[in-house]
Amino acid sequence: MYKRQYYHNLTSYLIAEGDGRGANYGVTFVSEVSNPVVYFNAFKKMSAKMFKESFGGEAYLLRQQHTGGGNVTHSVSVYFNSNAEALDFLANYMNTPQFAEFVQEAGTTFKSVRTYMEQALLQYNPD
């Protein structure tokens, strides 16, 4: 018998660090991930340590995309209280030891597809 997998959503939220309620600014990195287990573990370590940085953000979220235009499989979002904090993060995160460790562990398991910045104008039921 042929089984077809159905999803109630187009996205599964896999790993979250921090509390992004009320943080209306975000940066999202969309990727094609070839080895989710390695990528997930490296992301979990990096996101837990990134809060130590002054520009570390309020929350980190890793999603798996069930549908997504071509080669998109996962996305990571980092949330902030202001657009200035988001821009500070973008200017500095690549120079941190946390990001260097992430790239060393997961560097061959993902390819960047696109990155974008977002602003929530109104949150409905943020919890």
Label each PLM-derived region with a short phrase.
Residues 3-99, 107-127:
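Short S/T/G/P-rich N-terminal loop/turn motif that feeds into the first structured element of a domain
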